[in-house]
Amino acid sequence: MSLYKPVKIGNLELPGNLFLAPVAGYSDKAFRSVCVENGACFTYTEMVSAEALIRDNWKTEGLMARAYNEKAYSVQIFGGTEDVMQQAAKIVLEKTHCECIDINCGCPVPKVTKTGAGSALTRDPERLYKIAKAVIDVCQDVPVSVKIRSGWDKNTMTWKEAAQAALDAGVKAITIHPRTKAQAYE
């Protein structure tokens, strides 16, 4: 019995369920290409700063480049406000023609969370909803997903509320990193 099964994310139909997760510093174009060669049917870029995108940072744009053998991939963006995330989503769609946009709600790094982005969004479901809705509003037929953590710390396990906010906004898939922000990369 094969564990490899087709998956549907919104209107995106994928031939299999072997995905490469978005990991900052690791899921660059070259690594994604190697993973596709070894069976991954869907990949995510490492997280891309929405602020850097709207400021036209060429290095940031390079993070979004599709590998030659990627048939389907998602660009993951992070930011703390609806306006910036919506503008960034427009740029991603114009420059990449990716099959999905993923909202990072999992990064535990203080320079990200202090701006209200990354795992700070898991702690604030209302803001997560607003950001997801703003991104979805510009994506039209391109599905939007989110990656969340289980919570802020062991006393603030907010994954259910965050997931529900994302679903209420209309996201088509949710990835859960089963550690809290406080656990970081333990």
Residue ranges and their predicted role:
Residues M1-E186:
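Flavin-dependent oxidoreductase catalytic cores
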